[in-house]
Regions:
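Conserved, well-structured ligand/cofactor-binding cores
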Residues: 2-475
Length: 475
């Protein structure tokens, strides 16, 4: 009896191994391009992000619908392709997109990965042959699919991820600006004491910057709405119905909620990705603004005893700042955003160079630009969102500290400079910088206590005007 059981188990195991081998063989035959590409593309392990795979699925869905509507593709095959394209959009087959980002410059590897995968899945459904080129890639070329998918992915990520995050942090900064509108602190230029400002004015400046950035990106992304679909290999549209490009653009618009249209010049949209490079430059601009905000936050948070110490950020206490110094708190979220800024700026440099690759009819940096643009969008969306909720919304102004620093700043001498002259004021400022109390220095100039109180009235000093006009007698 045991021998018989062992024999049955052995047979089942043998059949299982045979089935696995057949499945591998079937997949290899179905995915010939992908399998062969491993030998000639780079194998860095850098795979396309979810957004790019989703965008390719959108393009294949739109193309199948359009080809069926035009009477070019059998309805049954077209329906199967659409079902599987939707599965690709949902992320059900992300593990099957195995081509490396560092591949042929046109993105043919990405397009053929989608074609072969969808054909294999659709064939299994229909129990018949769906061809990756004849059916899934009908009326298309990698040369219009790649640039289209890159634009769809980058535009969607910008509109649905980055712009909302920009608006979110701008709202948070506006709220913080109002909350700290009466919190006076020293201004600083060249990291040296300058005239006083309010904390609200400083944060309001960044709110305005991010509001402007949101408008700038929304304007830049409009140029990505022109798609080269229907241009096929070189932009002429050979082997595609003249109506195909417009139909695909409409279908992509339905799926994304964005207003994609056929490119005014398909030759331009096929050979140049400078519209995506321009968007990448916009991401760089956002990163620069975010970097400046983070640098200021770090300095204002520095301390608690040997730094500026004008704000506290309690959320940063949620993780230990040091593995050796107990109780140390570091601006960890802020520094995470600084790293994201550096990466986005670096990826933009790669994009500007990649956008110059290619000759004549075709762009040759398609897969890299698509990958980088989506990664840039991810980084910015995450960093801006975290900064808003974890840092900006939880800033605690150290009001007394800020006022004390502002009231002892030698820069306050600027108030009386119009009355006593620049040279005399500069000499007085040096005395104060070397330890002379500002009130004592002002008394020596002949100002009484009422006038000194007026000079040191911080509320007047953070508004436009010439306060010294109101002073009498001294100088």
């Amino acid at each position: 009896m045991p021998s018989s059981l062992s024999s049955c188990e052995s047979m089942r195991e043998t059949r299982g191994i045979k089935h696995l081998r057949e499945e591998r063989s079937r997949r290899a035959n179905a995915m010939k391009y992908v399998e062969h590409s491993r030998r000639v593309f780079l194998e860095t392990g850098t795979r396309f992000p979810r957004e790019v795979i989703w965008a390719v699925g959108v393009v294949k869905l739109a193309a199948a619908r359009s080809n069926v509507s035009l009477g070019l593709l059998d309805g049954g095959i077209g329906s199967a392709i659409q079902r599987k394209a939707k599965e690709v959009m949902k992320g059900l087959h992300d593990d099957r997109f195995t081509v490396d980002v560092f591949q042929t410059g046109s993105g043919t590897g990405l397009n053929m990965n989608a074609n072969e995968l969808i054909a294999e899945l659709a064939s299994r459904d229909l129990r018949g042959k769906v061809h990756p080129n004849d059916h899934v890639n009908m009326s298309q070329s990698s040369n219009d699919v790649g640039p289209t998918a890159v634009r769809v992915a980058a535009a969607y990520a910008t509109e649905r991820q980055v712009v909302p995050s920009l608006r979110k942090i701008a709202r948070s900064l506006r709220t913080l600006s109002r909350r700290t509108s009466a919190t006076v602190k020293p201004g600083r230029t060249h990291l040296r004491d300058a005239l006083p400002v309010t904390m609200g004015q400083e944060f309001g400046a960044y709110a305005d910057a991010f509001e402007r950035d949101a408008r700038m990106l929304s304007e830049s992304v409009r140029y990505l709405f022109e798609l080269p679909m229907g241009g096929t290999a070189v932009g002429t549209g050979l082997n595609a119905d003249p109506r195909f490009g417009a139909m695909v653009s409409r279908e992509i618009s339905k799926e994304t909620g964005l207003r994609f249209v056929p490119a005014r010049d398909r030759f331009r949209a096929t050979r140049l990705l400078t519209d995506v490079a321009n968007l990448s430059g916009g991401f760089r601009t956002v990163s620069l603004d975010m970097y400046r905000l983070c640098q200021d936050l770090r300095l204002m948070f520095s301390g608690p005893y040997t730094g500026i110490g004008e704000i506290d950020i309690p959320s940063q206490e949620e993780v230990a700042g040091s593995s050796i110094m107990p109780g140390k708190t570091n601006p960890v979220t802020v520094e995470s955003a600084l790293l994201a800024s550096a990466e986005v700026i670096g990826l933009d440099a790669a994009n500007q160079f990649a956008a110059s690759l290619g000759e004549f009819e075709l762009a040759m940096g398609v897969p890299l630009i698509g990958y980088n643009a989506v990664v840039q969008a991810r980084l910015l969306s995450e960093a801006l969102g975290k900064l808003a909720t974890v840092v900006i919304d939880r800033v605690v102004p150290m009001k007394e500290r800020g006022r004390m620093l502002a009231e002892t700043s030698p820069a306050l001498i600027t108030v009386i400079s119009p009355r006593i002259g620049y040279d005399k004021a500069a000499a007085l400022g040096k005395r104060i910088a070397h330890g002379a109390p500002i009130r004592t220095a002002l008394r020596e100039l002949g100002y009484d206590e009422r006038q000194i109180d007026s000079i040191l009235d911080m509320k007047r000093l953070v508004r436009p005007g010439i306060p010294s006009k109101r002073l009498r007698g001294a100088g």
